[in-house]
Amino acid sequence: MSENSTWGSKIGFILASAGSAIGLGAVWKFPYMTAANGGGSFLLVFLIFTLLIGLPLLLAEFVLGRGAGVSAIRTFGKLGKNKKYNVIGYIGGFALFILLSFYSVIGGWILVYLGISIADALGIHSTTDHAALFVSIISNTWIALGAQALFILLNIYIVSRGVQKGIEKASKIMMPLLFIIFLVIIARSLSLPNAMSGVTYFLKPDFSKITSSGILFALGQSFFALSIGVTAMLTYASYLDRRTNLVQSGISVVLMNIAVSIMAGLAIFPAMSSFGMESEGGPSLLFIVLPQLFNNMAFGKIFYILFLILFLFATITSSVVMLEINVGNITNQRNTNRTKFSVIIGILTFIVGIPSALSYGSLSNTLIFGKTVFDLMDFLVSNILMPLGCLALSIFTGYVLDKKVALEQLHIDENKKSSLVLFKVWLFLLRYVLPIIILIVCLAQFL
């Protein structure tokens, strides 16, 4: 691989990996689920699940990626010494291709809202009915498709520049800014009257509110929130040098993901409490509730623009890996024709994503199994492909991978008893515990 197909620094790898994990769900769904399921008690459950489930799976992807040092679709065949295992890599590549096709639709909405909000702050445009505005945007064919195309173009530009000059450079800029913007918004939110009641609502432990659905969400979120099971982290690890400590890097990624989820809640709930607004998650939070919320506070339009920029950064840092994986699969991680294949895959992604973009407009009445195309694609990736990928990852690493590869990649000293014990616990979880948990989460989503 050329120099530009490797990470320039450890922090670049960690920031890019954390950016891949920190997606929209961490910002607009996780805080709402936390507050609805006992606040601090839910956070404690999620933290335990993440350390026992998410981190072992994340380390498995890191081990496979760096251990093979090739594209995702070739990794499993190389390490398993049989090309039949490459099907796992193909599942991951397909999942991320489909995921980007509809994820880019939401990214496009954010770009449109950012433009409208800037115009609003400058007095060029004025909006009072945010619910009607949201419906008008997502149902307009040309706005939906144009915004989706623009978002994909941003991803093409970043990925076409390679690992160091594109993905790493973008991550080093966007991730620190994401945290800075969060801190600014949190400071403003906490300065409002009655803000602490919102903090209490979000973080106060109440184990009586933890429901079975909440526990299942925490279980699923413990690995889905880390972009595990679709070879995203595997691909990033394949660009890594041999000196980087994978365990330390994995813990850093996990902690950053948890931190962002908590910061999102601290940015939203105190302000909502101050203005007596009801909390909710999903797109309506960003595009309907928050505009109304920020309109009620001084300099609110500026803070809403900052929030949209924050969401845009979270979306882009997650989406670039979705494009990068398939570009890397085709170019075998060399920079040969990287720009050409970035454009080709980007165009194909846009074409496949057209029905999803039109799901709230001209195709809103087109239902497949009772779902819009957008919701069907989301269901396919979230409920089938990602769990299947996680299951395959756990079984392959636990049973097929040569233990010597794992010991080497995790820098385990076989003469240190404590290190060997932790390694055996990791292997035990992958072999016997995680497959059962993944199956439970999987089946529960169909009940």
Residue ranges of predicted features:
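Membrane-interface "cap" regions at the ends of multi-pass membrane proteins
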Residues: 1-28, 57-62, 66-79, 83-90, ...
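A generic transmembrane alpha-helix motif of multi-pass inner-membrane proteins
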Residues: 145, 372-395, 418-447
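Membrane-embedded translocation segments of transport machinery
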Residues: 2-7, 168, 172-316, 340-341
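Hydrophobic, membrane-embedded alpha-helices of multi-pass small-molecule transporters
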Residues: 8, 15-25, 100, 104, ...
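Loop-to-transmembrane helix boundary motifs in multi-pass membrane proteins
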Residues: 12-14, 20, 145-146, 256-262, ...
